[in-house]
Structure formats: C-alpha cells, structure tokens
C-alpha cells in the first residue's frame, strides 16, 4: 500500500514538472529508455551527472562575471555548454533561459549577463530540488519493491 502512495506522489511530481515547463519530452525519452532497456538507475545517473555538471558550469560563469574585464566569449561558451546539457536531459526551462543568456553574451552586457545568471541559477536550483525529490521517491519505491526501477 505504501509503495502505491509513493508512486502516486512520484506521478504527481513528474506531472507538475511537465506542466511547469521544467522538463520536456526529452526527459520523457530518458525515462522510456530506462523502462524499455531494463536499466534501473539510468535516469538517476543521467540526472545526477547533469546536476553536478550544471552546478559546476554556473559557478564558472559566476566567477567569470566577477572579473574586472569579462571574457564574454568564455561566458558564452559555458552558457552554450549548459544549454546543451540541459537539452540532453530535457531541462526545458534552463535551456530556454540559456538561449536568452547567450543574447546578453553576444551583446557583451555584464548587467544582462548577471541578470540572466540569477534567473538560470534560480531555474536550475528549482529543477535540482525537484530532481532530488524524484530520486528520493524512486529509492523509497524500490525499497518496497526491488523489482521496480
């Protein structure tokens, strides 16, 4: 009974992530790959790698924007990398924010980049918190029924 309640919570969480635009069909594809391939932990591994990578990239961008003379090409390269990582995991909102961020890089606008950094950081932290909750629910479900991924 408890596993069913946890599955309901997980379903509601995933549904809210889609409806809020945090994730898109690419994330759904990752889930399907896990289900069809019978590879438990695949989504967990991909999400964890994405979160670690995105956190590192955001910190690198912040460091670059603190410099007296900003290397906008370097900032843009990191934002492009974050956009690609976001797209591959289905992190739709972060991906769209990165697209806007890149425009500020091309305009060489420090203020615009700082504003975009705050937005992308907020979007990422929101998504990361949801991913962490999702992974915790999946672990709890698996503890009740080890045959489930």
From Swiss-Prot:
| UniProt keyword Cytoplasm present | yes
Q: How is it modified after translation?
A: Two-component system major event consists of a His-to-Asp phosphorelay between a sensor histidine kinase (HK) and a response regulator (RR). In plants, the His-to-Asp phosphorelay involves an additional intermediate named Histidine-containing phosphotransfer protein (HPt). This multistep phosphorelay consists of a His-Asp-His-Asp sequential transfer of a phosphate group between first a His and an Asp of the HK protein, followed by the transfer to a conserved His of the HPt protein and finally the transfer to an Asp in the receiver domain of the RR protein.
Q: Which UniProt keywords apply?
A: Cytokinin signaling pathway, Cytoplasm, Nucleus, Phosphoprotein, Sensory transduction, Two-component regulatory system
PANTHER family linked to this entry? HISTIDINE-CONTAINING PHOSPHOTRANSFER PROTEIN 2, PHOSPHORELAY INTERMEDIATE PROTEIN YPD1
A molecular function GO annotation? protein histidine kinase binding
Pfam families of this UniProt entry? Hpt (PF01627)
Name the gene for this chain: AHP2
What the entry says about domains is: Histidine-containing phosphotransfer domain (HPt) contains an active histidine that mediates the phosphotransfer.
Q: Describe the task this protein carries out.
A: Functions as a two-component phosphorelay mediators between cytokinin sensor histidine kinases and response regulators (B-type ARRs). Plays an important role in propagating cytokinin signal transduction through the multistep His-to-Asp phosphorelay. Functions as a positive regulator of the cytokinin signaling pathway. May play a regulatory role in salt and drought tolerance during plant development.
* Signal peptide interval: none
Chief localization class? cytoplasm
Q: Which GO terms describe its biological process?
A: cytokinin-activated signaling pathway; phosphorelay signal transduction system; positive regulation of cytokinin-activated signaling pathway
Inactivation phenotype: Dwarf, narrow leaf, small grain and low fertility phenotypes.
User: In which compartments does the protein localize?
Assistant: Cytoplasm, Cytosol; Nucleus
Spell out which residues are annotated as carrying Phosphohistidine: 80
Recorded source organism is Oryza sativa subsp. japonica (Rice)
- More info: Plant silencing simultaneously OHP1 and OHP2 exhibit phenotypes for a deficiency in cytokinin signaling, including dwarfism with reduced internode lengths, enhanced lateral root growth, early leaf senescence, and reduced tiller numbers and fertility.
Tissue expression, as annotated, is:
Widely expressed.
The GO cellular component terms are: cytoplasm; cytosol; nucleus
Q: Give start-end ranges for the coiled-coil region(s).
A: none
Q: Where is the HPt domain?
A: 39-144
**Identification of the protein by name:** Histidine-containing phosphotransfer protein 2
